[in-house]
Amino acid sequence: MNILIDFTQIPIQKVGVGVYARETFFELLRDTNNKYCCLVQDDDKDMLNTLKSSKIIFVKSKWFRFFFFRFFLEQFYIPWICYKYKINIVHSLHYSFPLIPLRAKKVVTIHDLTFFIYPKAHTIFKRYYFRFFIRFACRFADEIICVSNSTLNDLNLHIKPIKSKTQVIPLACEQPKVFDLESINNTKAKFGLHRKYLLFIGTLEPRKNIVNLLIAFEKIVKNDSCIDLVIVGKKGWFYNDTLTKVQELNIANRVIFTGFVTTEEKFIILSGAYAFIYPSIYEGFGLPVLESITYKIPTVTSNISSLPEVVGQAAILMNPNNIDSIYN
């Protein structure tokens, strides 16, 4: 079969969906029984290296990272590619796919239902755009992949798709890596990691509940003067609330914001953490907690949404809406 996978929806800085795309299809492309055709932004070196064994169709990133051109690519260019290369299956990794009827079977991955459950986490445009496409996918996709039972339950609650075409395929992460001493020391020096530290990894946005984590950490600092909080992740929606809270609590000298880091830097920082704290109030899966457990780091996470499903008995669960629960 000829299978088309659209990687143009994946940002250069790989978090969440980006990690899913890279790691899942790195394994899938070992399949020699089918032919894979991959649509990739021409500046995404990470994906190009991952997909080098498959047929790659480039698109100009300077144009197609703008929504209008992105929409054109998805709605018109992809159908043309399906026709030209006699595609049998087209897989969309991020909710949306062509509205034009295709001969190819359509597979779509649903990562979470934040557009319905936490609409304020998105711009008004994105909120309604993806609500439409999730509903459209549930009606017209031939197969719907949910990344957790929690996401499937949310989908059933808000949309009620046809059960026969939905299935749960959980995410996975890389095996732990061993890093040389020079790389470890260079990373620690780069980010000023000189004391033991608690670690959070994720985009700075309200859904990640970092403000409550900071309030709980301020209480920890009063009892342990030799511990820092390291926050790894890029700035997201309403990130200023997080920065403001650090100043209000007077803990700026104990909180380290790394910004976005490379994959190697992320895992070096993770492997050296005293504990990993993930107080998110909603996740479709929650890949960082799985990565933390894989590296055998003591992990504390929320007792809601998909997170109990992901960690099982391998982490401590807490109430993310209760400061004392996070602190304890």
Range-by-range predicted roles:
Residues 1-328:
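Carbohydrate transferase catalytic cores enriched for Leloir-type hexosyltransferases
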